[in-house]
From Swiss-Prot:
Role played: One of the components of the core complex of photosystem II (PSII). It binds chlorophyll and helps catalyze the primary light-induced photochemical processes of PSII. PSII is a light-driven water:plastoquinone oxidoreductase, using light energy to abstract electrons from H(2)O, generating O(2) and a proton gradient subsequently used for ATP formation.
Residues the entry annotates as binding [CaMn4O5] cluster: E355
Pfam families in the cross-refs: PSII (PF00421)
Recorded superkingdom: Eukaryota
Proregion span(s): 1-2
Name this protein carries in UniProt: Photosystem II CP43 reaction center protein
Gene Ontology molecular function, alphabetical: chlorophyll binding; electron transporter, transferring electrons within the cyclic electron transport pathway of photosynthesis activity; metal ion binding
GO cellular component: chloroplast thylakoid membrane; photosystem II
Topology of this chain in the membrane: Multi-pass membrane protein
Alphabetical keyword list: Acetylation, Chlorophyll, Chloroplast, Chromophore, Manganese, Membrane, Metal-binding, Phosphoprotein, Photosynthesis, Photosystem II, Plastid, Thylakoid, Transmembrane, Transmembrane helix
Amino acid sequence: METLFNGTLALAGRDQETTGFAWWAGNARLINLSGKLLGAHVAHAGLIVFWAGAMNLFEVAHFVPEKPMYEQGLILLPHLATLGWGVGPGGEVIDTFPYFVSGVLHLISSAVLGFGGIYHALLGPETLEESFPFFGYVWKDRNKMTTILGIHLILLGIGAFLLVLKALYFGGVYDTWAPGGGDVRKITNLTLSPSVIFGYLLKSPFGGEGWIVSVDDLEDIIGGHVWLGSICILGGIWHILTKPFAWARRALVWSGEAYLSYSLGALSVFGFIACCFVWFNNTAYPSEFYGPTGPEASQAQAFTFLVRDQRLGANVGSAQGPTGLGKYLMRSPTGEVIFGGETMRFWDLRAPWLEPLRGPNGLDLSRLKKDIQPWQERRSAEYMTHAPLGSLNSVGGVATEINAVNYVSPRSWLATSHFVLGFFLFVGHLWHAGRARAAAAGFEKGIDRDFEPVLSMTPLN
């Protein structure tokens, strides 16, 4: 028995019996038409780049320099600012022209890609194998597939090195840890030690460790891009020059749908990692542009009230809270001094406005009494009222914070969207992997419904 609604439907001379695909799987037409598939990919790239350029110009047109970026619903300008364009000390925007240039360059690029996509989809050769053998391929050709993989890896490596070049030679990048509250600087002293760079990969993902998401200085981030770019380029050269070994030929499925499933799996992993990075990391995603992280807003609230009550005469070192623990300060299980109250669970936050007040054993009481600077108070009060919480129609911020501002943080947008997209890509990976494996094993029509277990079970009622 087939699971079709209408197996006899024929569209454009195709039907399900002869092609193995239903009418709604339109992309299946392109599986063996490398020229048309190229057109679809180039046109898709054009749409992506058009969105980037148009959205970029939209954000520039709506941007108000007097308000922080994270209060304005911006998701592209913070990325440009993080790369050091248009900003000065403290993350203040001093020039929006670079943002305008970025938008226009992307729009022009999208026109070129759009023309190429339409050309290859409608006018160019249906298949590339005959006229352009270098660009042609057959999905089963394992050697050609690993060559294409190698070319992609080299392009990714070049992309990683573009960030390195920007940080080292072309004006530098924004460093939220620069003294006095952040600034654009060139990265001079790269971290290239493999024990440091790969040490991040070996860390636990949990509190106080945080795997690669715990990276908190730009030297490590840019050094990591040197390593990653080098590995991608060397791996790319390797895959271009070699043929797959016997174990790889046996272990992997070599079909277009299998490659689709591998790609979806990889993108899913990227999405989940990006979600954690933008939610927790305030070095790669500086709080000046993206707003504070959740832990940062919570710790900022504790710090703000510590400052207030200390001015009013409270002894913040010994005041007891309603639970019998310290009201403002307490000790973590391992002995360091941390903020007390509900924010104790965020004890492992590191932020540029707070670190100067730490000593060798956590927060330093004498520094808290004598060394708090006005910029630290201002920044923590600002972050306290801008927690990345709240849904689209709610007042953003901590529910108990009466001064919270009505906004939705770009951290919420970016973390949520990447989690959801990562999840859907993962489901797509499972779906296409299952289909590809079934096709390779020769039973792509699904399980035989005549002998399904449910048929021999008693009715539920």
